[in-house]
Amino acid sequence: MLDHPLNSLGFAKPPAATRVVVAMSGGVDSSVVAAELAAEGYDVVGVTLQLYDHGAALAKKGACCAGRDIHDARRVAETMGFPHYVLDYENTFREAVIDEFADAYLAGATPVPCIRCNERVKFKDLLQTAKDLDADCMATGHYIQRKMGPAGPELHCAADAARDQSYFLFSTTPEQLAFLRFPLGHLASKAETRALAARHGLPVADKPDSQDICFVPNGNYAEVIQKLRPGAADPGEIVDLSGRVLGEHRGVIHYTIGQRRGLGIGGLGDPLYVVRLDPERRQVIVGPKEALSTRIVPVREINWLGDAPLTSRSEWQVMAKVRSTRAPREAVIRPLSDTEAEVELIAPEDGVSPGQACVFYAPGDSRILGGGWIWRGAR
């Protein structure tokens, strides 16, 4: 067996002797991963997590983890002939993801719950479940690449920049990366994924991509937070940078850093933007666009994926991404500890918000060096 050539998942044994748990959301991406591996002869076990039940509100296009998605994942497993299990993770998901999401909004931050879900649920509890099932590895439908480097597995951006999910996976640890596989990361486009789904005759080949956070139907964050934290939408003042009252708002949870529309304070001359939220005073602070400009970004809870320790240098030249929709920009990391740093953006960015992630990339390379969470004090 030791002389057997490496299979496509990197193991020196036949596919039939390699068990792989596939995390199946019911969407086309993870379905294609499962189908491709099953077709190659791997011992595939499909697992779908029941994360959140929002009743009928979630049974719609654009939401994930609904009953329909579980049904779709099961149909794919039946089509390809491998076992499929549904695990109830609702309590875990609420404690690890939803509660923090609500509390972060109440504190004036703009959280990214999908990162926490990967970090605390999918790549922690589900990964452990895969090991308990005697799997050799766990595969997902994420668009990201795992490449072997001189020091072990490395995390790299997807070949398709438009689909790259590295921003949401920066917290993947080296130990998790050793067990994970991302079979779609090398594909050039989503069209290739759908073509593979059609080739396998999968019932989800034309299923729309999910858009909403699974527990936020219609993208209405404020409505969900009000249900989770009654009284969260208390009204308060909209003030300018000098403290002058300009109007009244409907509750801090309705606003995000950089927001311009929907403030209800028109007719004041130059456009005004939300530059800060003060939940304790129930104030939304607005100012001109230049007030959004940020160069110094404090980052904590850093997951560092570089070969040398973060604190082995006083400075690291990197490319940094402060929002999922923005391109990485030149930056300098100045470590304060193994898990905290000050990040200086060479060119200032607008709308840097507490609660978002700051993800680090190697200059001139596709490698992800890690990242952390932006917290108060960005300037």
From Swiss-Prot:
The UniProt annotation puts the region (Interaction with tRNA) at: 163-165
Which Cys-Cys disulfides exist here? C117-C214
Q: Does the keyword tRNA processing apply?
A: yes
The catalytic site is made up of C117 (nucleophile), C214 (cysteine persulfide intermediate)
Reaction(s) the record says it catalyses: S-sulfanyl-L-cysteinyl-[protein] + uridine(34) in tRNA + AH2 + ATP = 2-thiouridine(34) in tRNA + L-cysteinyl-[protein] + A + AMP + diphosphate + H(+)
What would be an example GO MF term here?
ATP binding
Q: Does the keyword Signal apply?
A: no
One Pfam match, given by its short name, reads tRNA_Me_trans_C
* Top-level enzyme category: transferase
Q: Where is the signal peptide?
A: none
May I have one GO cellular component term?
Answer: cytoplasm
Where is the site labelled Interaction with tRNA?
H142, Q356
Q: Mind listing the GO biological process terms from this record? A: tRNA wobble position uridine thiolation
List where in the cell it is found.
Cytoplasm
Keywords from the named record: ATP-binding, Cytoplasm, Disulfide bond, Nucleotide-binding, RNA-binding, Transferase, tRNA processing, tRNA-binding
Q: Which InterPro entries match?
A: MnmA-like, MnmA-like_C, MnmA-like_central, MnmA-like_central_sf, Rossmann-like_a/b/a_fold
Listed SUPFAM superfamilies = Adenine nucleotide alpha hydrolases-like
Q: Which domain of life is it from?
A: Bacteria
EC numbers listed for it are 2.8.1.13
Residues holding ATP: A23, M24, S25, G26, G27, V28, D29, S30, L49, G141
- Give the protein's function: Catalyzes the 2-thiolation of uridine at the wobble position (U34) of tRNA, leading to the formation of s(2)U34.
Mind telling me which NCBIfam families this protein's record contains? Answer: PRK00143.1, trmU
Family as reported in the entry's similarity comment:
Belongs to the MnmA/TRMU family.
Q: What is this protein called?
A: tRNA-specific 2-thiouridylase MnmA
> Whose protein is this, by species?
Cereibacter sphaeroides (strain ATCC 17029 / ATH 2.4.9)
Tell me the organism's taxonomic lineage: Bacteria, Pseudomonadati, Pseudomonadota, Alphaproteobacteria, Rhodobacterales
Q: Which gene name belongs to this protein? A: mnmA
